[in-house]
From Swiss-Prot:
<dbReference type="GO" id="GO:0097503">
    <property type="term" value="P:sialylation"/>
</dbReference>
<keyword id="KW-0325">Glycoprotein</keyword>
<keyword id="KW-1015">Disulfide bond</keyword>
<dbReference type="Pfam" id="PF00777">
    <property type="entry name" value="Glyco_transf_29"/>
</dbReference>
<feature type="transmembrane region" description="Helical; Signal-anchor for type II membrane protein">
    <location>
        <begin position="11"/>
        <end position="31"/>
    </location>
</feature>
<comment type="similarity">
    <text>Belongs to the glycosyltransferase 29 family.</text>
</comment>
<comment type="function">
    <text>Transfers sialic acid from the donor of substrate CMP-sialic acid to galactose containing acceptor substrates.</text>
</comment>
<keyword id="KW-1133">Transmembrane helix</keyword>
<keyword id="KW-0812">Transmembrane</keyword>
<feature type="glycosylation site" description="N-linked (GlcNAc...) asparagine">
    <location>
        <position position="167"/>
    </location>
</feature>
<dbReference type="InterPro" id="IPR038578">
    <property type="entry name" value="GT29-like_sf"/>
</dbReference>
<feature type="disulfide bond">
    <location>
        <begin position="297"/>
        <end position="448"/>
    </location>
</feature>
<feature type="glycosylation site" description="N-linked (GlcNAc...) asparagine">
    <location>
        <position position="338"/>
    </location>
</feature>
<feature type="disulfide bond">
    <location>
        <begin position="466"/>
        <end position="477"/>
    </location>
</feature>
<feature type="glycosylation site" description="N-linked (GlcNAc...) asparagine">
    <location>
        <position position="308"/>
    </location>
</feature>
<keyword id="KW-0735">Signal-anchor</keyword>
<dbReference type="GO" id="GO:0032580">
    <property type="term" value="C:Golgi cisterna membrane"/>
</dbReference>
Amino acid sequence: MKPNLKQWKQLMLFGIFAWGLLFLVIFIYFTDSNSAEPVPSSFSYIETKRLLPLQGKQRVIMGAIHDPSFSEAIDGNEVLLNEDLLDTFKSETGSIKKWTDLEDAFRSEDEFFPSQIGRKSKSAFYQVNDDYLFAAGQPMSHNSFQEIAKFISADEDNPKESILQNNWSRQRRMRRRSTKHRRSQMLDESDDWDGLYSTMSKSFLYKLWKGDVSSKMLNPRLQKAMKDYLSTNKHGVRFKGKRNSKLTGDQLFCELKERVDVKTIDGKEAPFSTLGWEKHVPQIPLGKLYTHGFGSCAVVMSAGAILNSSLGDEIDSHDAVLRFNSAPTRGYEKDVGNKTTMRIINSQILTNPNHHFVDSSLYKDVILVAWDPAPYSANLNWYKKPDYNLFTPYVQHRKKNPNQPFYILHPKFIWQLWDIIQENTKEKIQPNPPSSGFIGILIMMSMCNEVHVYEYIPSVRQTDLCHYHELYYDAACTLGAYHPLLYEKLLVQRMNKGLQDDLYRKGKVILPGFKSVKCPERNNFPPL
């Protein structure tokens, strides 16, 4: 019995070994065969983003949420409309009207795709497919552009129109089904992140060009940001005026001319008077620095959309050029030029060592105009508790550079602009100061005969890239979260005297200076 038992045990061990060997062979076979197949990236886009280097510089966005935990790299600028398509706009009679026929093809169920929530990839929502217009943040394929160009320029009775529209409708329905699932999935993943980012739809951009947008068309998170700022009311805004939007562009211009007073801290009001500030501030007010003013002026926004614009020579041809914050010219001359006459800087520039305010050439040999958010009451006790303490570096700079014109804007001027924006907007706007861009436009309108503003209202190169010199993507930089940017841009669009083609191609708005236009008597305006 014992030999048989021993043989039985040996047989069992041999069987177990054989099964193990067979399992190992099968496992190796399948793993080898899978490795021969194309394998998707071993990291999701979100996981890969965590491996990207973080942005080194602090972003100079007054009041913006600062969260450098994500970064995004996109090859080139995210262009919304191809030049071939734009050429068709220009050449065809009634082409703008035909563009409205395409709006539905560009529109998803929302005016704003929340496809950058948490600065996550657009490809998280939309598959990369050449047949999809601007899918996943990629440029449209050449064939797709040719089809659209043919569609726009075709005759009204061309049967290809209905075929193409039907094809787009079918693709759109398929995309919506997959998008809803992807969108809900991404929203679930990003519930713990409170950023406010979205990507502009093509129909929204077109409506912005026409001045026909509202906050209801924004991404839900941007809408939530606006509601949060309204409820927080950090600056104690108590608006007592009336809201309407009935003024024409010319009437709005005259309203601004009548009421805007570019006021700076002159050292004569308390507490500055008791601190001896009269000896620190320039003796000549900003408005009288150039007695005859300027002829033509350029206001150059720092928006990423100005990349690849080749506007540098045109910008430098102006008599004066205004730039903002830490926006450089070196290395970007082809797109932004190199002339700088004035630079508007917010208080973060003076206080954050990363901006090298003390020793950078950006802030030398130019007029400097600084500002800091103050209470709506414009109480100058704000000196004791500014958002960022710009006063100490200001005095230090004035002592070292007494001949350089350097001003601090009076809170009364800043909130005066806010009042005018709110009075001319039906909706309640964010109770926060206007953007540096809007402030700069109004300052130059008071000093120049004509003002050319570049990429304030975005061109066809519109992108979520905040600044042309920083790798940071945020749709709030274009439409506003903290600042009432959307409403500012609608006012500027209303006053635009430039060509529509310049707006589409260059992102250029032309505004008359206050001294160049004679306005009628104030009682001719409708009551505010």
